[in-house]
Amino acid sequence: MAKTKQIIVIGSVVALVAVLLAQPIKGLVNKEKQTAAASESKPSNEVNLENISSMTKQGLDASLVKEISDIEGQVAKASGEDKIKLLQQLANKWDDVAKPAPQAFIYEEMAKVSPKFEYWLKAGNAYRAAYTNLQDSTLAQALNQNAIHAYEAALKANTSSLDAKTGLGAAMVSGTNNPMAGIALLREVVAADPKNLEANKTLGLFSLQSRQFDKAIERFKTVIDQKPDAESYFYLATGYENIGMKKEAVTAFQKSKELAADPSLSQFIDRKIAELSK
């Protein structure tokens, strides 16, 4: 299952970069059009666990769908700690097939039963994973607002959490009319913890999106120093490519290919290297 999830993540990297470069963050590139008011974080009532679960089950193996449905039936009759245990089983089932959207609603439900910081944080992280690179813009916006709500609840439970602040900052950049407020939160995290992996990675992605490639390169160098994975090398290579540093781009793309061991990504990288080597 872990290998399957890795391929799904790596396979989405190319598409994400294309989206990032095609849709600059409002307020970062076109600052004159930025509005100062941020959207309120209101969870959507129209998007819920029941319809997300039903939608996500489509295309899954019939036996797995039955397992999930059976647990859902038990959850409906349970309460307290018994309900928490069943919800965790349900979250694990969705995690096995890399489906963060239903996971997010499940963790939020766990937080409502037992309002713990860890449940709100997991809900926020899963919502964020679910809306990232999602083609359905209406659903993505709803999940984004849910992420903001979950991270805000997590921060209320633990005001010093850099993980919650990082998640909230990232969600605010992509889900409100005041992206600079989200960037400010991320910078607060980096000021407190200069090597913070997730904050640097998130700022690096937003630097790519706002076409600040020099800044993106520095962010991903910091990330790679701690966690040299295929995804980060791919983003680093993209930064180098866009400022004309072809040799460095080729080297980074090659490292991404080696670490990913994913045929579809390897083919794409081979084409990129051929173009850059001309």
Task: Describe these PLM feature segments.
Residues 86, 119-120, 164, 199, ...:
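TPR alpha-solenoid repeat register
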Residues 81, 114-115, 159, 194, ...:
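Short coil turns that delineate tetratricopeptide repeat
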Residues 64, 68, 98-105, 134, ...:
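Structural signature of tandem alpha-helical TPR/SEL1-like repeats
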Residues 89, 122, 126, 167-168, ...:
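Canonical tetratricopeptide repeat
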Residues 110, 153-154, 188-189, 222-223, ...:
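Canonical positions in the second alpha-helix
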Residues 2-13, 214, 218, 227-230, ...:
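Terminal, low-structured helical/coil segments at or just beyond the last alpha-helical repeat
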